[in-house]
Structure formats: structure tokens, C-alpha cells
Amino acid sequence: MKTYAIIEAGGEQLQVEPGRFYNIRHLSLRGVNFWGQNTKLLLYRVLMIRHQSATVLGNPWVQNATVKGRILDARRDDKLVIYKMRAKKKTRRKRGHRQGLTRFVVDAICLNGKVLLD
């Protein structure tokens, strides 16, 4: 059985495993480019941990559980095009939006101070 955790970050829930990278909504607590590369990241909103055959569920979060990681870079998602048109009225509006993302890699999943898997 593989070890993984389900976390809440950036308004969404992610199933994360150590050694893999993930994109979440941009972490801009203190400005756009405040978080640099290799900034350590501790995520405490862990909803569930699966380790070997044991499952630990939180209510709403697992006590004394953290996911350790580091930020790789800040990037932007693909452009989302919004096109509004009123038929027969010559009214058209085209706008685009690119969501800011933060890419981070998970280094370890910890429970009660012990690292479950590096």
C-alpha cells in the first residue's frame, strides 16, 4: 500500500504523495513574488492520512499531522477565454484570465512528529 495524504490547500482538496509536485492556487499572502524558490512549506490542514493498511481520518483535520514541502516556482495557468455575445445586437465582449499558480513538491508526511515516508 502506498502512503498518501489528503490535504486542503488553495481552496481545493488534493491527494498528495511524497516526491511528487502539485499546482495549487497562488499563495500570495504578502505580495505576488514574496515566496521564493525552495521556501519551506508546512501544511497543517490534513484531512486524511493513509499509511500501509492504516487510515487516519480527521474531524475536520487530523491532529498533529503535517505535510512538509517546498515551493518550486510560481507560474500561471492556461488562459481561460470568456466570450459574451448578444445575437443580432452587434454586442460582443472577449476577455481572458490566467490564474496564478504555485507549484510545490511534497517532501514528507508527518504524524505525531514521526515522518511516515520521505
UniProtKB/Swiss-Prot annotation:
Q: Which domain of life is it from?
A: Eukaryota
**What GO CC annotations are associated with the protein?**
chloroplast; ribonucleoprotein complex; ribosome
Keyword Ribosomal protein listed? The answer is yes
Keyword Zinc carried by entry: no
One MF term from GO for this chain?
structural constituent of ribosome
Its chief place of residence is plastid
Q: Where in the cell is the protein located?
A: Plastid, Chloroplast
Cleavable signal peptide: none
A Gene Ontology biological process noted in the UniProt record is: translation
Key words, A-Z: Chloroplast, Plastid, Ribonucleoprotein, Ribosomal protein, RNA-binding, rRNA-binding
* Pfam families, per database record: Ribosomal_L21p
Function, as annotated, reads: This protein binds to 23S rRNA.
| Family, per entry | Belongs to the bacterial ribosomal protein bL21 family.
Q: Assembly and partners?
A: Part of the 50S ribosomal subunit.
According to UniProt, the name of this protein is Large ribosomal subunit protein bL21c
In its UniProt entry, the species of origin is given as: Zygnema circumcarinatum (Green alga)
What lineage does the source organism belong to?
Eukaryota, Viridiplantae, Streptophyta, Zygnematophyceae, Zygnematophycidae
